[in-house]
Amino acid sequence: MDRVFINLHLVSMVNKQQTGSDGYQVVKDVMIGVRNGKVEYVGEPCPSILHGHPDIIDCAHALVTPGFIDCHTHLIFAGNRANEFEQRLQGIPYEEIAKQGGGILSTVQATREASEDELYHLAVHRLEGLKRDGVTTIEIKSGYGLTLDDEIKMLKVVKRISELPDMKVSSTLLAAHAVPPEYKNRSDEYIDLICDTIIPQVVKLNLANHVDVFCEGIGFSTKQCERVFRTALKHGLRIKGHTEQLSNLGGSALAAAMGADSVDHIEYLDEHGVKALTKNNTVATLLPGAFYFLKETKLPPIALLRQYEVPMAIATDFNPGTSPIASLRTIMNMACTLFKLTPEESLRGVTCHAAQALGLQNFRGKIAVGMEADFAIWQLESPAELSYRLGVPDLIARVVDGEIFHEK
């Protein structure tokens, strides 16, 4: 062993079939052995594990969970839209704000004007809040460039962030986020650019794991999204979708049928769509931050998702317009208070189910032999406190590939 963690209380998130427990209950006085960045032992204290003089970390009866995974973010952008926040509070509708040059296209303009270095430093600063909440893996999307060069610029920033030693990154191409101004009323031609030029070039440069789309009346049609998905799959990329946020176009069922790892937002998802998620083992990613920030009233179909046993992930959806919230624990609380998830569902949503939403369920999101050694060590007594209490610095340290990172 390279490193052994002793005197810890474990919340493994490993399911009943594998352990006989539910993975959420606290198992006291556990030892974890790590070698080459992976978990090699989990169980009762075992003196033989200490042979070879590994580095011993006494957790002093702290609570240990899998490292948190924020599986849906728009972390990279320039500018901010605080002025729009004020306008919305005054009752000005989004459509009017957009006509005045606001909305997503204002972020596109600012992001296009920013250099790669500027975007990198802005994103690294934003990461700090997520780190304090125990995040060890983050998904980051492009989507504020909307040209070949600017989408690649954003994805190069994602790649630079992935080189940080204390954060793992999953990269998503979201060129189909909005129709850029130069393609106004020519969205099919913009889809041509995405499929014929942007996706092949991103694959050539190895800059993305997934391709995402915004399937909505104000975004792209199911026919257009299907074409993007087919192109992505043909080039060996995984797929996911922003679907059923504002209306029910059938984007979730389409994405699931094509093998999507997750569909996200899903406030308007119906039973047909839920059945499609079950059939194709697609994760439903809930984004309560956007629901809260936009003062929406249409709740996701939580009862149906439970009935059909669809895994539910939750994420910050961190972005400048509709969820400028860099706190995954705040989002966990919102998932409970706004969407009526239980604290257990909330914790699964940022660990094992979030890993599945990124296609990483065999590597992260649980603490078990063979998994990557990504943990969060908390000064807490029970896992329910993670959703219950906000603003208190409960995190002692994050562990990424077995390396320890103490938070400021």
UniProtKB/Swiss-Prot annotation:
The keyword Flavoprotein does not apply. 4-imidazolone-5-propanoate binds at R81, Y144, H177, Q245, T322. GO terms for cellular component: cytoplasm. It is found in: Cytoplasm. The keyword Transcription regulation does not apply. It catalyses: 4-imidazolone-5-propanoate + H2O = N-formimidoyl-L-glutamate. N-formimidoyl-L-glutamate binds at Y144, N319, G321. GO terms for biological process: L-histidine catabolic process to glutamate and formamide; L-histidine catabolic process to glutamate and formate. Its EC number is 3.5.2.7. InterPro entries: Amidohydro-rel, HutI, Metal-dep_hydrolase_composite, Metal_Hydrolase. Keywords: Cytoplasm, Histidine metabolism, Hydrolase, Iron, Metal-binding, Zinc. Transmembrane segments: none annotated. One of its GO terms (molecular function) is iron ion binding. Binds 1 zinc or iron ion per subunit. Gene3D superfamilies: Metal-dependent hydrolases (3.20.20.140), Urease, subunit C, domain 1 (2.30.40.10). Its main location: cytoplasm. Pathway: Amino-acid degradation; L-histidine degradation into L-glutamate; N-formimidoyl-L-glutamate from L-histidine: step 3/3. Fe(3+) binds at H72, H74, H242, D317. NCBIfam families: hutI. PANTHER family: IMIDAZOLONEPROPIONASE (PTHR42752), IMIDAZOLONEPROPIONASE-RELATED (PTHR42752:SF1). Belongs to the metallo-dependent hydrolases superfamily. HutI family. Catalyzes the hydrolytic cleavage of the carbon-nitrogen bond in imidazolone-5-propanoate to yield N-formimidoyl-L-glutamate. It is the third step in the universal histidine degradation pathway. This is Imidazolonepropionase. It comes from Aliivibrio fischeri (strain MJ11). The gene is hutI.
